[in-house]
Amino acid sequence: GDVYKRQDIYVADYNELAYMPHIDNKGKLCLFETEGILIDQNLPGIMMQSLLRAQTILKQGFSGENKNDFINEFELYWAQLKDCRIAHLAVKTDRKNRIVKGGIKKIPQKKKEKQIEYIKRCKKAPIYIGENVESLKRWNLEKTPVMNIAYFVIYSEKYIFPPDIRKKLSIDYLNALLHFVPEGELASIMPRSRQDRIVVFEIHQPSGQTHFVGMYIKGGMLKETSLEKVEELQPLLMERADKKFLMKRVTEQDSENYKNRILIIGCGSVGGHVICELAKAGYEDLTIVDYEKLTEENIFRHVLGMEYVNRYKCEALNTYIQKNIPEVKITTLAERIEDAIIEEDIVFEDYNLIISATGNHNLNRWVNSWILDNKIEVPVVYLWNEVYGIGNHVAYIKYGNCGCYECFFDRDEETGELYDKTSYCKRGQIITESAGGCGKTYVPYGNLVSLKTMLLCLKMVKDIFEEKLDDNLLISLKGDNDYLEKHNLEISGRYLRQQERIKILTGKQFVNINCGVCNDCNGK
């Protein structure tokens, strides 16, 4: 057995006692939360620890000292009510009484299933509740009839405690909650007729805590602020799925930052990961641009799978995100960014941040020139991988700061050819491979390389919106050179000179005094 297992302790004649916290509907005492608690490993120690905790719970329960623990664990007790059913809730907590939308997925009857057993299963079928019909799409409820659901927001000066879990949920408890709703609003939101209905309550306690509970009501007539002649009342446990609640587990930023509009150019290996992770990070207004379609040869280094082959990458990513990540607005454009800018389908000034994830130096140089020539003050993040994972690079460039993207390039004194000064791969080598002739070349690197670049990007995006960056930056992550050597390619002098795994250069350090775009430090 589990040597760390606590001993279960039950209360005899539990139904004869007053209703008290930390005892479930079968009389078992809830002794400890296992998370963060050190439990004695020997049996006598476990017994003593458990008995002392049981004594404390009962003593505080009889005296009423721990009554407010009901408030801290309201939903836990609600879940133990008889016939409690799961409901998934994705609505805005905007403090308004209103009608929201919902649906119940129909459960098919099994071939040899008795009707009474089928009815029991149907009563446990999950319910899905959203702000509107559009918000229900995340649960694939296309063929499910949509219901109007009453949503009431309650503020109480006194604590509202969960009902006694040893008894069925009563009509009196329901009506006590309905009495908090103004009669006029109640009549307009909840139908008076004797039809099945669902009611959701957002309960605000005096302590500032908020609880979400619901009820499935069969029959009943509304009279003033009470329901009468209810045939059946079933408690609903609300599993919250709204963005505000879900983001509590992951958010590290001010929620206002997530409203920033971000333009991402390129939906390939790096861009695809960046777009998905920006959505997961909570950013809710993304515009993504890419004129290419997803092909089979990209599958093993792209976030999307075979399901999306031969679709435009930007549109496929939108479909994928809308299926999996709630409350993200994505605008797609299957067009070359140069054409989109010239035709004004895209206006850089409309965004708070631009991310270029194409890995195409020539395109990035074009974007950089357009930004600086037009004195656009929207910051730009450029991302690119190097061949065989020898390096990952992220650059932050903002007009008005020293240095620009063009500063990363110089000309060979002997040949006059342009080369990339940031590269960890020695210049003059052929680093591309062919996938079938002219126009089908690519730079070889794996999915892990793109993930590393994506992580550098996300950290930079966070720093930008938290206003932590004062200078233009180039961040370079040095990779292993094993694969490079296996393919008979040589490393650059920069790779040899760099001792650190990550090298950060400011604009003043990487600026090219002969740059014809930023003119050193934008004239400063």
Predicted segments, located by residue:
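Short amphipathic alpha-helix with an adjacent loop that forms part of the alpha/beta core around
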Residues: A340-E349
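Glycine-rich adenosine-cofactor-binding loop
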Residues: Q253-K293
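Glycine-rich phosphate/adenylate-binding loop
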Residues: D69, E73-L222, E349-L353, A357-K524
